[in-house]
Each structure stands twice: as C-alpha cells, then as structure tokens.
C-alpha cells in the first residue's frame, strides 16, 4: 500500500513551491465565496490558509484514519472558523462514502484531489470507487479537479531513453530496458523492467534533488480515467500540462502570486516572469485534470469523449523499442472508439497526446 503522505521537503524546494503556486491559482480560479469544498486525502490540511483566504462556506476533509484528520477536527473545533467543517475518516478509493457521510445536504461545489490521484490507479476497482464517491459528493454542476503527475511526459521521456539505449546497438541486449529517467532536478525509476505496460498499477519512484527519499506513484492512463469518470457521471473538461497552465494564467495571476515564485536566493522565474528552464522542467512533470458533474437544469455540457466498454479486458500494451513506438504503445483501446465520438477525442489527442498533455516537444503526433 502506498502512503498518502509525500516525504517532507524544505520550504525552498523548487517542486514544492511550484506546486503550491498552481494549487493557489486553482483555488483562486474555481472557488467562489461561501462555496462548499471537499478535500480528498486532506492529511493535516496543509492548505488551511488557502481555504481561509478563499472565504469558503463549508469544508469537507476526507482521509484515512492514520492521516491525523481527528487531530485537525479537534483543533478546528477549539477555535472559531468563519466557515463550518466536517471530517470523514475513510479511504475514498476503497470504501463507499455512503457508509461514512450522513450530512448529504452539504454536497460540494468542488472536490479537490491534490497530487493523490496516482494512489487510486493501482487497480481499476480503486479508480472506479474514487470516481463514484466523487460523483456522490458533488452537486450538479460541480467540479472535480486537481494535480497529478503527467503520464504523457513521463512515458515519453522513458521511451526516448529506451530508444536511445537500443540505438546504441552493438552489445546491448535486446530484452534489457533502462528503468530510470534522470535530470539535474529529479530522477524517475520504474520498479519493474518489463516489456508490458498495464493501464493500471504501473509503479515508479519520483525523487527530487535534495529529497531524502522518493515518492511512489502509479502512472495515470488518461483515456481510462476519462472513460471511468463518464461511467460515474462526470464529464471531461480539461487536462492541461502545468507549463501551459502557467503560461495561460500567468498574466492574470502573476501580480497576485509572483511572490510565491521569488525569494532572496531561489528565483524560479526570470525578470519578465517567465519560468527558468529548471522550473519549466519540473513543472512539466505535472498536469491539471478537471471534470464536471452535469446539471440537467442548465445548458447540457459538452459530451465527454466516449470510450466504449467493448472488450476492455485491459490487456497490457506491448512495448516495442523502435521508431514507431508512439503508434504501438497504449493503443489497445483505440479500436473501441466509436466513429461518432472520434472527432472529439481526436481533438484532445492531437492537442494533448494519448496519455495526457505534456510539453509540446514530447507530444505524440499520431491521433487516435
């Protein structure tokens, strides 16, 4: 079982400061005054000040019993908050929320899952449970959103490493694959070297420079996430790499949040507010994801690209280390895309790559 808590990092960590910037930006963009927000895997609520500043009306914190939620509940009850709160102790990707949540008149306007989605894709059953719980939590018209490692970026970097390894030729063994990605800022290591790449449960360790230990994640297969979200009653809105999120929103947020990216000795942006290369590299490892629970009383939402159940037996996609790897890998469900929805999905894929967004230079050129 993977822990719901990442290792502690110093405040000046490049990764941590960039993620905090994006979390603050998402809250500023999506949370209206007096909104009801739900925070999945809230831990000891490190974002308490953000919720205070957002002037929310009600807070729902959910995490496993060992997360320290009970301590937060006691602390919040001992002081007067401007908003009400409730805390539920259970694992939302394993247990049914109906067994724990009795105050259902307080459905959420927004459900956040900040950096913990990879904990829920170890199996298809876990992801299904999470998404059905999210759908139960949300009001019609409400949003489910958060931040997760960008599988498109990570997988593309990994396959480029494998391609380069085999292009060396000569004494290289054909069935041996490098299992790590390295940069000056981080190292990504896959736990198992194998030719198969399952849709669920593909584990890897992400360790940033200066960290004592790495974080264990599972790659998120975005087509499966979109399909299962739709089954749970959630429509796809957007999946956007954080480099693009920063570029799209920096003009609006720079004045408000620039101080989060600059301090006396660890600037993450240049004088014009543009990300430095090391910041861009780290930020590009992550993506936002946004889904919406449709409201039948309002204009019908845009249809989520439909991936039919078909023969979804989730056979592992075979990895072939050659020039055509982009076309071969993670394509088992391509044949299940019906013609009437292919244009919508193609648009997403052309823009984002078949696993998610990723920086432009790492995107796949072949649309589904």
Where are the language model's segments positioned?
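A short glycine-rich, Lys/Arg-flanked "PGG" loop and its adjoining helix->strand segment in the class I
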Residues: 126-140
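A short acidic, Gly/Pro-enriched loop at the edge of an enzyme's catalytic core
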Residues: 98-111
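Class I SAM-dependent methyltransferase SAM/SAH-binding core
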Residues: 45-97
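Class I SAM-dependent methyltransferase Rossmann-like catalytic core
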Residues: 1-32
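Conserved class I S-adenosyl-L-methionine
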Residues: 34-43, 60
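A short SAM/SAH-binding and catalytic strip from SAM-dependent methyltransferases
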Residues: 108-126
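C-terminal lobe and adjacent flexible extensions of AdoMet/dcAdoMet transferase-like proteins
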Residues: 187, 191-368
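Conserved beta-strand signature within the Rossmann-like core of class I S-adenosyl-L-methionine
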Residues: 140-149
